[in-house]
Regions:
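Active-site recognition of the HExxH zinc-binding catalytic motif
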Residues: 55-67
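Active-site scaffold of zinc-dependent metalloenzymes
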Residues: 3-52, 67-90
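Short intrinsically disordered terminal tails
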Residues: 1-2, 94-98
Length: 98
């Protein structure tokens, strides 16, 4: 299983189609998260618990992927469900050393 700590397990940077995205934590953010496709930045509200922070990251990651695919209209129910499945995968994956 994935490591279980108290600190959220989210990327600080990642690449999609050759573009580097940055993840930042913001003290005063009205929403739980925000995906800015022009700045290639995901902002996450600071101070949330571990699970909310991770779920928000995966939700915003789905937005980032869709923007990268050229999709500008995102159905929130799809984004939320797909992000939750990615988070579940990440939290329950089992790795084996080769």
């Amino acid at each position: 299983m994935a490591k279980k700590g108290t600190k959220p397990d989210v990327a600080t940077t990642f690449s999609l189609a050759g573009a580097v995205w940055t993840v930042e934590f913001v003290n005063h953010l009205d929403d739980m998260g925000k995906c800015d496709s022009e700045k290639q930045t995901i902002s996450i509200r600071s101070g949330m618990n571990k699970q909310s922070t991770e779920q928000t990251f995966y939700h915003e990651l789905v937005h980032a992927i869709m923007f990268t695919m050229g999709k500008l209209n995102h159905e929130e129910e799809f984004v939320d469900t797909f992000g939750a499945f990615l988070h579940q995968y990440h939290r329950t994956r089992v790795t084996h050393e080769a």
